[in-house]
């Protein structure tokens, strides 16, 4: 596979870690095999070193767009980006507003599924009683 210059990869790796979290990126990189190593590099160079590194839209806005698209398409990566939205200052209330647009333009079932994931990610977890185990 033709490679972009190393600066695109390095820039993409830095942006990917800032948005998704270093632990997630390191796990994804460690799980790469000969079958998908070039694909992982391409994602880092193109999506993260290219599109996410552009400056016209701020990261919060990019995250709203990404979340809305993933919700509309029913993609598994929605949960990852809901978690990562904390890293870009994307408020759950703003995500909920974007999901209203998903409901109108992509369908209520898509938005309903996304709202369930949004609530699961941002709903307060019940506190454990003292002396109980996890």
What is each of the regions a protein language model found here?
Residues 20, 48, 67, 73, ...:
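Short glycine-rich loop/turn motifs that provide flexible caps or phosphate-binding loops at active sites
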């Amino acid at each position: 596979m033709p490679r972009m210059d190393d600066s695109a990869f390095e820039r993409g790796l830095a942006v990917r870690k800032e948005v998704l979290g270093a632990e997630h990126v390191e796990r994804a990189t460690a799980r790469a095999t000969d079958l998908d190593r070039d694909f992982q590099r391409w994602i880092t160079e193109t999506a993260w070193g290219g599109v996410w590194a552009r400056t016209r839209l701020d990261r919060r806005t990019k995250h709203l767009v990404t979340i809305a698209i993933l919700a509309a398409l029913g993609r598994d990566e929605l949960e990852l980006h809901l978690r990562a939205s904390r890293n870009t200052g994307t408020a759950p209330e703003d995500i909920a507003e974007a999901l209203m647009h998903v409901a109108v333009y992509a369908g209520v079932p898509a938005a309903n599924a996304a709202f369930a994931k949004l609530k699961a990610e941002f709903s307060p977890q019940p506190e454990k009683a003292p002396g109980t185990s996890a």
